Amino acid sequence: MASAPLPGPPASAGGDGPNLNNNNNNNNHSVRKCGYLRKQKHGHKRFFVLRGPGTGGDEASAAGGSPPQPPRLEYYESEKKWRSKAGAPKRVIALDCCLNINKRADAKHKYLIALYTKDEYFAVAAENEQEQEGWYRALTDLVSEGRSGEGGSGTTGGSCSASLPGVLGGSAGAAGCDDNYGLVTPATAVYREVWQVNLKPKGLGQSKNLTGVYRLCLSARTIGFVKLNCEQPSVTLQLMNIRRCGHSDSFFFIEVGRSAVTGPGELWMQADDSVVAQNIHETILEAMKALKELFEFRPRSKSQSSGSSATHPISVPGARRHHHLVNLPPSQTGLVRRSRTDSLAATPPAAKCTSCRVRTASEGDGGAAGGAGTAGGRPMSVAGSPLSPGPVRAPLSRSHTLSAGCGGRPSKVTLAPAGGALQHSRSMSMPVAHSPPAATSPGSLSSSSGHGSGSYPLPPGSHPHLPHPLHHPQGQRPSSGSASASGSPSDPGFMSLDEYGSSPGDLRAFSSHRSNTPESIAETPPARDGSGGELYGYMSMDRPLSHCGRPYRRVSGDGAQDLDRGLRKRTYSLTTPARQRQVPQPSSASLDEYTLMRATFSGSSGRLCPSFPASSPKVAYNPYPEDYGDIEIGSHKSSSSNLGADDGYMPMTPGAALRSGGPNSCKSDDYMPMSPTSVSAPKQILQPRLAAALPPSGAAVPAPPSGVGRTFPVNGGGYKASSPAESSPEDSGYMRMWCGSKLSMENPDPKLLPNGDYLNMSPSEAGTAGTPPDFSAALRGGSEGLKGIPGHCYSSLPRSYKAPCSCSGDNDQYVLMSSPVGRILEEERLEPQATPGAGTFGAAGGSHTQPHHSAVPSSMRPSAIGGRPEGFLGQRCRAVRPTRLSLEGLQTLPSMQEYPLPTEPKSPGEYINIDFGEAGTRLSPPAPPLLASAASSSSLLSASSPASSLGSGTPGTSSDSRQRSPLSDYMNLDFSSPKSPKPSTRSGDTVGSMDGLLSPEASSPYPPLPPRPSTSPSSLQQPLPPAPGDLYRLPPASAATSQGPTAGSSMSSEPGDNGDYTEMAFGVAATPPQPIVAPPKPEGARVASPTSGLKRLSLMDQVSGVEAFLQVSQPPDPHRGAKVIRADPQGGRRRHSSETFSSTTTVTPVSPSFAHNSKRHNSASVENVSLRKSSEGSSTLGGGDEPPTSPGQAQPLVAVPPVPQARPWNPGQPGALIGCPGGSSSPMRRETSVGFQNGLNYIAIDVRGEQGSLAQSQPQPGDKNSWSRTRSLGGLLGTVGGSGASGVCGGPGTGALPSASTYASIDFLSHHLKEATVVKE
């Protein structure tokens, strides 16, 4: 950097000495310096003359005078011509038109002096460093002298400074208005450094049309690109937005991030040569490093640290960290105290400031409502921020700007808003000239912050001994936000700590130190006691035990309403408050930028909640409605919150719930999930109703129409779900974010407990009942159910997150890490009913009147037995950290069916979910509801069903006719001890009858419907529930197609593809895992994997029902192919899809039939799959003469086998489920299996056909249940339930491919391990 200018005008002879003579033409008295210098381009020597301000010459004066001339640099061809009055100078450069004067060096010249004017770049080369320094000082001093002299007058005649930005002109440069803090840069410079570059049409240069010759202007915090002959920068980039920069040869590039006004991208520019490019690079890196060090020394935050003597300021996290710094006073930092961003893009010249500016709206919207003095009716102070309303609110002009002088002249700083470029005394070297004495008024502070923002006027009438704010001695209405009574500019980015902290002299006891102007809405966080002296300038953040601790004093009227305002700026809410205060001035300096967060300390629960009913100030004038965020971390439960002291602590750990010992303060789940799901416009629920609006007990809650903001009868309306899923056209796309429970303004009942402190930030669409109510009291009715019930904040969370409960053997620990397309259920568990006839919840007609399936998390569902929600006080009231990772968009609103899903599966790659939990019904579906009716098996999912959490396995209405993406490559490792389902005696269902789980009806994002009475007569004739030994008998194919919901939906819906789901259950199962039936695949769906059925590898120690897995079958065919299943030897590492199956020769293929089609082998578990039919019965695969060579080549065949003889499992005979029932296959035990020791490398499944498979019916083209069945391995697994092909893995008969045929159950039992054959490579 150049050295600072010398104080005072330099000697008339400097550098190489004056070449003065008595020639009147030379106007000797105005010549400051002259001598030979070289021009940069060609190196020609020219004679340069530096003239100070004055007339054009004596001759001109004698002729009648001429307008005074600005300081200028002239050059002549030679000294002789200058002395001999040979003619006019070859060139005249007005110095006040210079953007900057810099020392430079390039490849040719080491000692350059560069002058950057509005329209050109001019550089001269000195012979040595001393000569360069002499000219540089002379130039800068002359410019500084001219500016200081022009402070109170207009520009001189020849001056172009009125049109220049920044200190040099009437308007502040958009990028350089903050340079003159202290004496770091010469006072002559609008910018610290200026380079002339040629922006190339590459990256942002092309997309933003930034090409051509620009001036790259570096200021303390920004770099601006000023086009030639332009006054304002075309683009201003914050240094903090620069991700990286570099140079190569003569090119220099900058990569900026998303927060830049241009958006993310790169800017490429070409300098004169590589030396200049390197200089640009190094200089910008140095500036970025300095800024980084400044921020490290002074932490970035939207809020202020409290206390003027704080050496370790408390940094409150801000919503958008790129907005501002914490501005410590110069007395503490010794560094520049400026807002983090310095300029506006395309702000009108009249609005420009001379010292700095705060970033108003986001950086790109400066010209509109951003912060132009003309745009919002708010003149800009010299600090670049809106002025506080006062008698001297005039738009800045050049005379205002320069009236106080610049450089180190703080004595000229006045009380006018246009106090000067250094009005805020930006460094320690500047005395605090404008700081008012502490005795200005009883409400002012003696601040060491250096800008004297000490006044804290109180509301009128609150404290009679204090003067009214409007009668402040200095006549200016100050605000505690920024504008102080001393007349310092109200700079929102410029607030000192004493404005927000509790300095020893702070009058914080009055809790309402603010004027009635919008600027002062940034309310100060109160110290907990009157003096705050013992806090030593810190804001109290401790956790009081009770209100006896140190609650701050409540004030009534305006002050009480002010307490609930967070320390913030730019507050905007999408709703209108119940009552509004009239804002005296439509200016909002304190609303300008910050979204401040305040931790307040009143309330009962140990969580932070927003303040009073009117929880955020609603001002009539919101100048920036597009960028307001209302983040309040307060704890006021109601205007009369007398429920005990809140500790002021906000739990920030994910999943960790804060507890408190209160009887009514079971803090359940202080967890806020922020998982991205389907996105739509936000909608917030403003007035949640009380329990008085609840329907009577047992009544169903009808689902409101999708897409509208719901109002739920939640407990006190404490949860505010600003879910962006609920869109409405009037939303402007912004939502208020509450980190606390806000009571309804109409319901200030202090007895109501606010529920969960966390907002549902997930853009997931709510269920059919909208965003769920916080309690299941809606199901039980009456307000008595709300008493003593904790606020389960997860009720507003996506279905993935819920508290575990083990009531009625129903544990909800099943977590899904799949990529569901449909809505993730909360693992709908259907509690055992007192009467089997009670069957399912809601009406039996399948209407969407289930109150809790869609809206209430499972842990809060009311149990018909207990009569109270499960999982409440009896359960662990803690937040369950989500172990379910959604890879695709969750769909929880019926409105999601407005957006068609792609039929092409988005394979997320092989996700493996390892669930260690005591799953009550993980592996076995809950018996009573599932066995309730035939329709229940096709319309309801159990929590144990892996498909119950899968998008395409989600049951719903049959109106959803879209295809679901296959949940490919999903492996579920379930270490659980499932409990056996209670067998039911109702007819019409079998335990294994889960044919409807993956039916088309199951692909809907709706909650499970109550089982509907089957409308088909054949469903009334289904066999009775089997004996325990018959648990694995699968339903007949006709039952799968004739049941009520399935029959009505399978023809009109294209089912999802739940391919490649492998559930490996390691646990002690009371009963065998229930088979899950894959749905038929649509004809046009591209099968992403040969394993379309749900393969469950159940490695369990069966304690009962072991023989149920065994099936009468023929001895194994030695020529039969095997299904090779590979477990990942690396222990469940999620492999990239590119490395999943690089080739099909990694194992010895049992049959080469699929080897040519390796592109479909993207399952996580199936490496090379080949199934060959049993030769028994001479049935062919899929009914053809030849088996298909690959899943993709299998022809869809339709078969409706007759209803008869679903063969029961015979527990007395060795099973052939896997293929070695007492035959030639050698028994294999898990303990001795090399495959188990090596991580279950390969499992050979021998799927055998059955005799009599020729008895299958012929295909019927209309049956979609068998569409594309043979296109995947699930379809090749055969049909189950017909007379010829019953069994879990029965070989397919002649075209008989019902939905029950695609389940391959591979069970490694503690005994009877003959069923498994582990194949080593």
Curated annotation (Swiss-Prot):
Gene3D superfamilies referenced in this protein's UniProt entry, alphabetically: Pleckstrin-homology domain (PH domain)/Phosphotyrosine-binding domain (PTB) (2.30.29.30)
Ranges of residues in domain PH: 16-144
Keyword Ubl conjugation attributed: yes
UniProt keyword annotations, A-Z: Cytoplasm, Isopeptide bond, Methylation, Phosphoprotein, Transducer, Ubl conjugation
Gene Ontology MF term list: 14-3-3 protein binding; insulin receptor binding; phosphatidylinositol 3-kinase activator activity; phosphatidylinositol 3-kinase binding; protein domain specific binding; protein kinase binding; protein phosphatase binding; protein-macromolecule adaptor activity
Motif YXXM motif 5 in this chain: 734-737
BP terms from Gene Ontology: brain development; cell migration; cell population proliferation; cellular response to glucose stimulus; cellular response to insulin stimulus; cellular response to peptide; epithelial cell migration; insulin receptor signaling pathway
Keyword Protein biosynthesis: no
Motif (YXXM motif 6): 814-817
Domain IRS-type PTB: 191-295
Disulfide bonds: none
Residue window of motif YXXM motif 2: 594-597
PANTHER family hit by this protein: INSULIN RECEPTOR SUBSTRATE, INSULIN RECEPTOR SUBSTRATE 2
Free-text function comment from the UniProt entry: Signaling adapter protein that participates in the signal transduction from two prominent receptor tyrosine kinases, insulin receptor/INSR and insulin-like growth factor I receptor/IGF1R. Plays therefore an important role in development, growth, glucose homeostasis as well as lipid metabolism. Upon phosphorylation by the insulin receptor, functions as a signaling scaffold that propagates insulin action through binding to SH2 domain-containing proteins including the p85 regulatory subunit of PI3K, NCK1, NCK2, GRB2 or SHP2.
Protein name as it appears in the record: Insulin receptor substrate 2
Lineage: Eukaryota, Metazoa, Chordata, Craniata, Vertebrata
